[in-house]
Amino acid sequence: MKKSLIAVALLATIGSTNAATIYDKDGTTLDIFGNIEVGYRNANAAKYDKVSSYNSSDSTIMNTAKIGISGRSQINENLYAIGMAQWDVASGDSFDDLKARHQFIGIDAQNYGTLLFGRGDNAFYTVAGVSDIFHDLDFEVSDYYLTGDQNPGLIMYTLSSLGWDLRASFGSAKSNINNTPLNYKYQFAFSGSTRLKSDITISYALAYYKFSYEGDVRDQVAYFAKKMQNMYHLNDNDILAFANANRPEHKIDKGIAISYGTYGDGLYAALNFVSTRYEHYSHHLYSYEAVIDYAFENGLGLTAGYGCKRFHHTNILGDLNLGVRYGVNANFNLFAEAQIDVNSNPEIYYSHEEITDRALAENKILCGAEFLF
């Protein structure tokens, strides 16, 4: 489970429940926080892990950790400087396996909003994130996770007022987006959400990505060529020339979400729908995610959900997720999750390499324990 850039900003603003304050003087505080996780994963779940590189066909026991630091300093009565950084640490033998998650500094102007600069999720996460509640085996069928997830060079402004939460973000140039050959010149996103008196939240978001093609573009063209070949029924001799002449210059995500309750406090349910349009694609991509969770007062939590991604009237991905967790105390949790393939046809859209590397259309199982600090 991830946290949005704004949600993580709250760690710097008000502190985390498990964070340890290491400095508190003259209106400035500094906290450290994180977790250590050890668990069993079958081979497909191990390949799915984004922190560790795992290519074996065997199940394994894996360990990872997250470490973060956050700070807050009062400038005047209504203005605060905030900062935060968080990293994933895989089970390697050195810090070469360190991966940045969120890194930002910013200004919290209270009633006038929060302005952040750094690395994180763009404003579209307001919609995509309502179903991001599983411990590790998230759906990620939404195409948002290809281009908008945890990007550097991001500027985000958030204003919460009169029952509305408004967010706008702009991202500067980025190469090799999320381990793909794709580059974008810039991106921007906007979202708005409101919580009704019935404890229902409704959200809408839009994101635009301008792709960049500079220097040697063969890998980028090949990435789209493999997808366009199935769309336009092209033979191997024509596909590269076709893809180069019709390479997408932009991508647009539009999404809407509705949720009930607050995750971790009794009943929580959410549904989102995302439409994605690549220039020169024959059809839109559509994704749907629905989740339900119940957190009991004794620390037990049960989660279930279904996610699917469709292209040209066909499910290219379909996953049923089940999860259980138990909080032994505020710092120690046990968890287990399963992701079951439901009539996926990834070969219609994805390349063989993507299907293998991401273990698409494969059943995944994991269980483990984590210690929070």
Spans of model-derived segments:
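Repeated loop/turn-to-beta-strand initiation elements of outer-membrane beta-barrel proteins
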Residues: I75-A81, N111-L115, G163-A168, K197-Y204, ...
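Outer-membrane beta-barrel "beta-signal"
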Residues: Y326-V328, A359-F373
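Detector for outer-membrane/organellar transmembrane beta-barrel domains
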Residues: F190-L322
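Outer membrane beta-barrel
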Residues: T21-R41, S56-A173, L182-Y184, S193-L196
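Residue-level signature of outer-membrane beta-barrel architecture
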Residues: G71-S73, I107-A109, L159-S161, G192-L196, ...
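Transmembrane beta-strands of outer-membrane beta-barrel pores
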Residues: V38-N44, W87-S91, R119-A123, S161-G163, ...
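Gram-negative bacterial Sec-dependent N-terminal signal peptides
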Residues: M1-A20
